[in-house]
Amino acid sequence: MQPTDSNHSHHLAWLVGAMALLGLFLLGLDQSLLFDVDEGAFTEATREMLVSQDWGHTTLNGIDRFDKPIGVYWFQAICVAIFGLNEFAFRLPSALSGWLASLALARFAQKEWGGHAAVMAAIVSATSLGPWAMARTATADALLGLFFVLIFLDLWRSLENNHAWAGQRVALWVGLGFLVKGPVALVVPVGTLLIYWLFAPAYRLRIKLLILNLRSWLVFAVVALPWYVYAYLRHGRHFIEGFLLKHNVERFMGSMEGHSGHWAYFLIALPLLWLPWSALWLRALGNFKTHWENPFLKYCWIWFLFVFVFFTLANTKLPHYLLYAGPAMCFIIAYSSLHASRLTWILTWLLALLGLSILIMGPSYLHDYPEWVSDPYYKALLEGSPQTDMKVWIFALPLIIYVAPAFIFFLRLSKIANLKVKTSYLFFTLALYQSLVLSMVTLPWWSRTLQAPAHDLAMMFKEDQRVVVQWGVHLPSFATYRQQESPRREPMPGELALVKNIQPYWPPDWEILAVHGPLSIVKSPEIAKTNP
């Protein structure tokens, strides 16, 4: 075969692989209802922005919303304008972000360590439980994850090769991240650079030049600051207090919405977020000293450790905060796989099968034993959950034995990896199997279990033009599906209210219009007319 033919075949294989990966990210995107609170809040804010045509500000049920910057709402609104008001459109920006992040990681890994590492980086990014979940969630986190990947890669290119253009691209990505999520997009790379300056003396001059580059700061300012200036001019101190202080400073200094945790919180979350690949990270941890001698791996570990320590010190703790270390984790795991022993792969298989078994069998047991849950609201939801035979997918695992050879044959044919059969190729099929089952079976079950009452009541009253408030509940997806605002307050005379019915807290003379599981729609009586 001529070199040009070989290159053409190679590029075609990468195109096919990229399209297959896109299919994986789009798989089941519309199979699950929107999850409250986060997905409901983001999607309702986007819907209200489209209705008002006010593209510079968001509201939630008519109240100013300062939780996140404007960027994610723009992306969601564009997709909704194209594909309609549905779960697929709301989640599409996250899915595309996960896909592009995986491709960027694969491209870098291919140049750094070869074709096998490229496939590893892409599959790890696409199938690990945490990144997989974020790519199917209509929030800002997958978009921020994409920008963190691009920041991570271009930051290293700038340090390693002293590329001025790469440094300015970093400023662009940081600006976009700032527009999507806020100051954390700047804190993580700057914090990583400062620590790398301490441990890598050879790079100190380049780090200094990168941080003090006025052109890069200008790029950042042009991208990120116009909306912030507009928001401040429009809302004044309310924007400062609502966004910068409450949703940034207070998240670090105090616990918001009950999301606190022990200092060891992320030690528990870490192996769960990176299933089924967690054992490879544990092996990398054992080789930390060897990795530290490699400048790029040192950079990966410093990025990871900064994220881990910074958010461990924060009082508000959420699992997805650890995903800000995503690009570093993907490369650490990919590199570890290149040198993994047979024993390491056996442990990886065992831990992955254990994790997948719990994820698949958990719903069946919770359905059969809802008394395991103490919260009466969630206990009632589980009691009304759909019957599931999900555990049958555990017994389908042997199918991997038949699917794996076809996957290996594709890799050989495409010349993406060398011709030698590697143990990791067999494990790819388990990772893909996990994504398939979770996307098409497990996640839809959880969405019906947790969200069906709110969704079905919203659809029941969608054509009803009367005001329906949320009283004693916070389920913003109810407003998204009903396509009408649903303020959180006590109902006024004659208004309807979405309430929890486990322990009724409304007066006995109120009319109950509909009941679905632990939720009801009730109507407050009109003000009685008095005789003159």
Predicted regions and their residues:
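Membrane-integral, polyisoprenol-dependent glycosyltransferases
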Residues: 1-344, 363, 514-522
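Membrane-embedded architecture of ER/inner-membrane glycosylation machinery
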Residues: 2, 10, 168, 287-532
